[in-house]
Amino acid sequence: MRRTFTAEEKASVFELWKNGTGFSEIANILGSKPGTIFTMLRDTGGIKPHERKRAVAHLTLSEREEIRAGLSAKMSIRAIATALNRSPSTISREVQRNRGRRYYKAVDANNRANRMAKRPKPCLLDQNLPLRKLVLEKLEMKWSPEQISGWLRRTKPRQKTLRISPETIYKTLYFRSREALHHLNIQHLRRSHSLRHGRRHTRKGERGTINIVNGTPIHERSRNIDNRRSLGHWEGDLVSGTKNSHIATLVDRKSRYTIILRLRGKDSVSVNQALTDKFLSLPSELRKSLTWDRGMELARHLEFTVSTGVKVYFCDPQSPWQRGTNENTNGLIRQYFPKKTCLAQYTQHELDLVAAQLNNRPRKTLKFKTPKEIIERGVALTD
């Protein structure tokens, strides 16, 4: 027999999912099957729908349970109506539209009433075609809903018809009943899951401690670097792909300007050469410091500093949050180069195009300016 859920049970499904509970565990709690839980969540992308306000004139679940009890006791329709202070015709229609006296079930009848009573508010992007076109264009450029919303507010402040909240974009993508943005456009989001996940995930597989000879610890970094007041202080790391392929990523702490470098290998010679060549091509005001993790790929950090004048600082073991700007940017880069991708197939020109897209995205932390705007303005002021 098909399992039906009360409104309270449905609410608990969404609450458990929001808190990071998996399909199987939710199913065990409610005595259901994981596939049933997934189907319930899928229709709204894991987002809890708004509770519908019931009119006083409509039958409630408790009244429907009284109807079921009365039918089981072989009471007449009129007697049930009198007990509930309802019109006999109301009770009669309720029973007939829900499989009659013999098969009437309160929960099924209540769920059916909820389905039939839905009067969805017209979707904003269904009504506003210019806005929909803009949103779709930016999604295809891999902008986040928050970046799209903030960019519209900053660049088109007087055009009230071109306003949309990030949550409206998310709901239009995830609610399958809304067709203004096809749910397949979820692939353009940073986390392209079919359901929205909670944030309560743990990281696994952190690398062990590696001793860097003569490495300067991050705790000796000056306050001027920590407060992000000047350009030229970078965070860096490697992003790995299949077939032992790697790229190096660099992010300026103040502007969030991103550089992606193609590497011949992960060895310290290859990494040192790529970093040295790149930093020597930058203006002197953008060559101040570099913060890296404790990977052996930067074992030649002293050679790098002598060649470029850039001081290198190393994070504590298993402390990726100490270069959080770079960690966040690597997540953005993974939109373009998912795991199990061979990174060796991409040319430096192709990597530069990806970096250009990231550098032209408005960022909330920059008040929806772009990294390119910030770094170009900063360099111009020092000329």
From Swiss-Prot:
UniProt keyword annotations, A-Z: DNA recombination, DNA-binding, Transposable element, Transposition
GO biological process entries: DNA integration; DNA transposition; transposition
GO molecular function, one term: transposase activity
Keyword Glycosyltransferase appears in the UniProt entry: no
Protein name: Transposase InsI for insertion sequence element IS30C
UniProt organism field: Escherichia coli (strain K12)
Family of the protein in this entry: Belongs to the transposase IS30 family.
Gene3D superfamilies, alphabetized: Homeodomain-like (1.10.10.60), Ribonuclease H-like superfamily/Ribonuclease H (3.30.420.10)
